[in-house]
């Protein structure tokens, strides 16, 4: 929301009169998966609070660094920029998201399926069962690091990223984070494909 402050996400220090000192109260960023719903409704200063967390897996508040949980993943939804009350995401922040998907509207069959699925539930709530522990996700992430990538694949990744910097149809080409992201994605795909 437009009135969301950085401290609402990161947490803040508060004075404890009983102990006569300041204590840190963790914000919702201290989690494994942070869902930033409609991220571009948050003001730029609040969006900026995510930059260090997304890159360094830590946050610094009043000179004190706080490590975030492992794994730490940010998923975000975004409204079209032309919607009233939205702010553009800065390039530095967009650069930290590995993947961007444009969902769009479902076709007639898919939308009918959504309604059929909803009609089978009696309430608007449903339960979600965990599929993996945070430790298992870290283990899977670490297994990706063991995947060998041929030089030809690395060259293809670099060529692809470099082409985004030369193409006049691309407003802002990919940064080196794009190469690193494609490198990581190719390794993950190899693991998922059983290679």
Which residue ranges define each predicted feature?
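AAA+/P-loop NTPase substrate/partner-engagement loops
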Residues: 1-18
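Beta-to-alpha transition at the N-cap of a short helix in the ABC ATPase nucleotide-binding domain
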Residues: 6, 46-47
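Residue-level signature of catalytic and energy-coupling elements of molecular machines
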Residues: 9, 50, 97, 157, ...
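Conserved alpha-helical scaffold flanking the Walker A/P-loop in AAA+ ATPase domains
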Residues: 15-35
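Canonical AAA+ ATPase core
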Residues: 16-21, 42, 54-146, 187-192
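Walker B catalytic acidic pair
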Residues: 37-38, 49
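C-terminal helical "lid" subdomain and adjoining coupling/linker elements of P-loop NTPases
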Residues: 148, 164-195
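Amphipathic, well-packed alpha-helical segments that form the structural scaffold of globular domains
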Residues: 158-162
